[in-house]
Amino acid sequence: MTTHLYILTGASRGMGLAMAEQLLQPGNTLLCISRHANADLALAAQKAAVPLSQWTHDLADGEGASERLRDWLLAQNPADFGSVSLINNAGVIPPIKPLRQSQAADLAMALRVGLEAPMALSAAFVGATQAWPMPRKVLNISSGL
């Protein structure tokens, strides 16, 4: 059976959790990167017999997450997968208010999680899988940038 690898950020709740639950299908392997692991998702993966790894990592540190992803991908055997997809879904929405009332720290956090981390993760993903012979995809989802 061909295994499809999905790497999904922001999978511990909301739309990311809903996507992760839908990806718990036979033939898929799922790596989730979120601030918190989700015990219900782990249980659902176990029941579905779908390989699931949950990394707890705050994507405000996109560089650290991208280095870990690159190293992990380089340690994988490409022959184990029929396709590989990175879904950048994590995001932080700062308090909604006029820009003049916004705090610089809130705006910076939103940019780190919603822009810097997806760019760094995408670069790591594309670089580490460059020689992989199967289809590779990157999907970026944004809630507020």
Specify the residue positions occupied by each region the protein language model found.
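Amphipathic alpha-helical dimer-interface segment in Rossmann-like NAD(P)H-dependent oxidoreductases
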Residues: 74-78, 113-134
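Conserved glycine-rich Rossmann-like NAD(P)H-binding loop of the short-chain dehydrogenase/reductase
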Residues: 26-42
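Conserved glycine-rich cofactor-binding loop
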Residues: 12-13
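Catalytic Tyr-X3-Lys loop
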Residues: 103-119, 139
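Rossmann-fold scaffold of SDR-type NAD(P)-dependent oxidoreductases
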Residues: 9, 81-91, 114, 140
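Catalytic loop of short-chain dehydrogenase/reductase
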Residues: 91-92, 104, 130-145
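Conserved mid-core segment of classical short-chain dehydrogenase/reductases
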Residues: 82-85, 93-108
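Rossmann-fold cofactor-recognition segment
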Residues: 47-63
